[in-house]
Amino acid sequence: MEEFQGYLDLNRSRQHYLLYPLLFREYIYALAHDHGLNRXIGFENAGYDNKSSSIIVKRLITRMYQQNPLIFSAKDSIQNQFFGHNKNLYSQILSEGFAVIVEIPFSLRFLFSLERKXIPKSHNLRSIHSIFPFLEDKFTHLXYVSDVLIPYHIHFEILVQTLRYWVKDASSLHLLRLFLREYWNSLITPKKHITFFFKGNTRLFLFXYNSHICEYEYIFLFLRNQSSHLRSTSSGIFFERIYFYVKIXHFVKXFFDNNFQCILWFFKDPFMHYVXYQGKFFIASKDTPLLMNKWKCYLVNLWQYHFSVWFQPGRIDINQLCKYSFDFLGYRSSVRLNSSVVRSQMLENLFLINNAMKKFETIVPIIPLIGSLYKSNFCNTFGHPISKPTRIDSSDSDIIDRFLRICRNLSHYHSGSSKKKSLYRVKYILRLSCVKTLARKHKRTVRTFVKRLGSEFLEKFLTEEEVVLSLVXPRTYSTSRRLYRGQIWYLDITSINDLXNYE
């Protein structure tokens, strides 16, 4: 047990980074607003034209020197200068700069790890679609799966205490407490209406949430490696990280609480896979339900004792993989048994051999897609196409190009679907919504406008996939048609955007 405890000491840096003084450096805010560094996170205009203007930063810093807005009192808690009249602007600017600063210890540790292993940073990137071929190869041989929602902290102070292992600057931690205290409810309530602050400060809250996920996964992966004689060499993709894609090919060391030392020997699973995605994770194994129940008990104890998060064991279901479907990255995935009957004749005897083969299927769920189209005003709640009044002022070519771009992105991302019937319906909604928008702009009926456009307009939507396929396959009709009906995983997709982001 002492040997285990030696492995469990985290290799955290003991250096004391003085991060708080960087908050008063203008270049930090320029980095925060650099779209080249934040391509995946869009920035909403906060009411000023030049987002990187040093004048605004100087005024903010001067105001912070002249006043002490971070101190709350009963008298001015409502009309505080910091969270008062200019609450959105000032808090957004500060939190964006603070998000860049607090990531410094993590980024240094990440780059040092790559240099120590002589791994080029570019080789560590993985497409979102790269996980699906992995699932197709591995999940057909597994038997049980558990799909779990990762619980949130009940209090922000627990999250701050976790960060103390990495960030040694007390002033920075106090400022983080300030942001979390003010906006904690919007962070831990996903269904709640997203406030202006939350939309404009996604990077800070992603950092706070990912630090919790990182701490949990360090412990989880340590126990996984301890439970098996086989090293964890599979590629693990963490979609919610600030540095998104990580390879797990080394022995993970983690801090471990004394409450779990007695159950380390329980887990001897030689064939288990773990995938985390969008606030959830699932573990799949080839072993018996008894072992899966032991992992279930471990997870509940881990969250309750180490992270002080109450989690009911009944929320972790153990299902047979061949009878269970789970939603994963815009797909509904499952393992199905495909039966094939082979007729064999030997001399005068005739045999019928029934072969059952497992196949990993990925289907596009139509209801979530129609919900996204409805939120973006492409259709009503029943999926009937409607016009887009916000695009009437644009030119005809601009309107058509926007609809084609959305259609192309959807076709590109969902090209790996086993059945494309749902995708055809979505394309039909977009095509008819585009026609209705153009007809409304020119004050004509849909039928009249379709006759005016002719067949060339419809061909733009119908031939979009074949144009993409021609880049990766010979331009023959049979090959293009066969690939279009089959599954294609494009390995150049590194982010997922809602339909509204394509507007």
Curated annotation (Swiss-Prot):
Its main location: plastid. It is found in: Plastid, Chloroplast. Keywords: Chloroplast, mRNA processing, Plastid, RNA-binding, tRNA processing. One of its GO terms (molecular function) is RNA binding. One of its GO terms (biological process) is RNA splicing. GO terms for cellular component: chloroplast. Pfam families: Intron_maturas2 (PF01348), MatK_N (PF01824). Coiled coil: none annotated. PANTHER family: MATURASE K. Belongs to the intron maturase 2 family. MatK subfamily. Usually encoded in the trnK tRNA gene intron. Probably assists in splicing its own and other chloroplast group II introns. This is Maturase K. It comes from Agonis flexuosa. The lineage of its organism: Eukaryota, Viridiplantae, Streptophyta, Embryophyta, Tracheophyta. The gene is matK.
